[in-house]
Amino acid sequence: MTRASRRHRVHRYTADGAVSARADTVAGEEPLEIRLGGRAFTVTMRTPGHDFDLVGGFLVSEGVVSAAEQVVRMDYRGGVDADGRRSYNVVDVVLAPGVVPPDTSMERHVYTSSSCGVCGTASIEAVTKVSAFGPAGDGVRLPVAGLLALPERLRAAQRLFDTTGGVHAAGLFRFPGDDDGPELLCVREDVGRHNAVDKVVGWALREGLLPLRGTVLQVSGRASFELVQKAHLAGIPALAAVSAPSALAVELAEQTGTTLVGFSRGASFNAYAGRDRIAG
């Protein structure tokens, strides 16, 4: 099986001129080809691990599936690495009868990089999708203290980041009660922030939890248009980020009724959209 991290020999240089050799741990990044019924659909760069969750979440974000029963099975297909070992870098998905596969306008003409999940889509229209779950009517209340606690809770769960310092994370939380702290439901890490989110959504798909009403998605980096879209398609009413959102992310959050929080650090955050859900 491919690995989420690998050891690599590095040379460390310091300001005083000293040079030392040591082993360092770096995050894994390998291609994953996604096939639908044996037909190539896309190739994405990802950190190996939770691949079926990644594929499931990706299909949700493409508007292909919205429930676990719409996926008959996922299997690793053939493929070997340079040493002749099985690579586990090809996943084939069999969709349930009646599930319409993506049309040609949605197919990826180039690979999907770990930093961009919509790069290579065949048309602008294919980027903006309609959710089966729209979160606009979700009346969940989000306590300020609870939202402020999310980045630290997410950081404490980042095991791969602890060893590599080179991956993004996405964590799904909920608040059981007004006076209760955040409950972590799932955390996933990946070199690509959109992959980490897909892995969380794919976990929820597999567990039969979609739509994800009453939850908050906390991410370790910035909030892009694509992350707001992925949250929207999974029925997640709130997205929080430790860094800034983009202008298009704010616009989409306003249009979809998604609560969007940015610069969530220390004792403050900014609410860019959907502040009516935030309870002081």
Q: Where do the language-model regions lie?
A:
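Intrinsically disordered, low-complexity regions enriched in acidic/Ser/Thr/Pro/Gln residues
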Residues: M1-V187, V191
